């Protein structure tokens, strides 16, 4: 065929030909074609787009060459561990100054009174108040430099951040204190850290500190600064024992009149000493540098940079304790980008009201709260039809999530999930959970229902909060993600638990610029945690999955041996039993002189009555807790879950006690991160545990 003939055949029709074609169509056909074209155009422009992962999800980490089995993140393609993300933000002082510059003196710290809208302090106001407070501290015998430790004993509020920034402005070190440490622990920390100044929020905390001084337990404490108003009687009481009681406003006024030029810290300078709670013996003070904190949140930024990068219009709700590094690292990310942090009113029961008023975009949360959300959602689906529809809608959304689509505007959102999203303010685009294992079932459902990206991290205070993090696009559950770009992770044999690295299992060890410098004045426990090569031994047992992600499978800490010689990790068992529908909280107890386990169960007051009714058991919550048939039904449900999860018979509890009141931070049975305080639980339920063993024998 000739070239000219081919071109003639392939040529586009002339406009006159097209016009003639369309004129030959009926009006009905033309309308139909137009409607079809409009629908197609709308679909093309509005179709949901899958999130593009930053790496191959089948290979999220790789072995380090000559690293003894250590693995690293593949994100970023650099073999060097990440120490910082921005050259102008290498200390916590610089992080805040960067936010001040980016925001253009925008809103920074928010607070609200009951039934009132949020009020905001600007970045410039916060920075100025921090300089005045820091200068005032210097006028009251504090010294510039990392030898000066300042205690902060307060609930989350703007003044906490101002006090922290005041310390950083003059290279001083922050030491958070919190109620659940207990009176004995607080005096131990004040003495160990040589703290002469403590900043508190409420008068009763100042009174507690004065009692220690009056008993001559903390002779070095000389100044207590109060954020809230107080009576003259408190000031007079302080004078009698040699402690100056002053308002935070008075210290700021003093600093305004006697201003000192900032003396910023260096990356290697100590920034904060976080004392752990919930363990036996005295608290351990983890020493973290500015570089530690910056490296940790830089790892988070690197992982998420192409998918959900922080913005100036981001708003974070702050309710997790600021004494915990998980909350502090997430807040640092927000400040670094000129975002806003709004504080809850101080009552967790009003958190939903605060979120509706604040409308946050970032929501850091612990798994226990996610579990409560999940239980409440399904409890409200109070008929079999409602539950079926809810599960059906969730499955449709979960199918989208598996294909990488995260959205909140589907038909299923309109019908079912928008009310749930509205309860969180309606603007949440990122949820980060950590501090404890999250249930795969709960995480999978909420990723669908909340229509936002839900990330899970793993770590501990000693590695500045996180060492692994969900890779964007990997919305599978049952693991804690891949190593952050700021650290390597390796597994080592745990012989006593029969975990071996040759099987890809072992104790999790972390090394990198986010790993702490040791415990304050505690060489013995520092050597237990950090080996001679700088590896942090976490005490957790992990397993590498084929995709290069890490799965937490056990815990070396808190393990004990039963009388027959079998090792038991109670937290692993508790994480299985907590999935029982009527169970809100559980404590599994074992003894080396006993051959079996027993448990303390707190039923969920919102779920348990209806669950019991289905079993034919009637009564109020208090009445149900006393009924033997209900106790048996709950135990049977727990044991069934244990069997389904592969627990050995010796890992199953043989008897339980039903307790009506929740374990809480206030009653001393939970840490501020809502983890069980096992020694306290053991002592609190000593009588009930003894009775369980007697009856079971």
Curated annotation (Swiss-Prot):
InterPro entries the UniProt entry points to: AMP-binding_CS, AMP-dep_synth/lig_dom, ANL_N_sf, LC-FACS_euk
Necessary cofactors: Mg(2+)
Membrane topology reported for the UniProt record: Single-pass type III membrane protein
Keyword annotations from UniProtKB, A to Z: ATP-binding, Endoplasmic reticulum, Fatty acid metabolism, Ligase, Lipid metabolism, Magnesium, Membrane, Microsome, Mitochondrion, Mitochondrion outer membrane, Nucleotide-binding, Peroxisome, Signal-anchor, Transmembrane, Transmembrane helix
Cytoplasmic side stretches: 46-697
Broad class of where this protein is predominantly found: mitochondrion
Keyword Ligase applies: yes
Subcellular location: Mitochondrion outer membrane; Peroxisome membrane; Microsome membrane; Endoplasmic reticulum membrane
Pfam families in the record: AMP-binding
EC supergroup of this enzyme: ligase
Family membership noted in the UniProt record: Belongs to the ATP-dependent AMP-binding enzyme family.
Official protein name in the record: Long-chain-fatty-acid--CoA ligase 6
High-level lineage: Eukaryota, Metazoa, Chordata, Craniata, Vertebrata
Gene: Acsl6
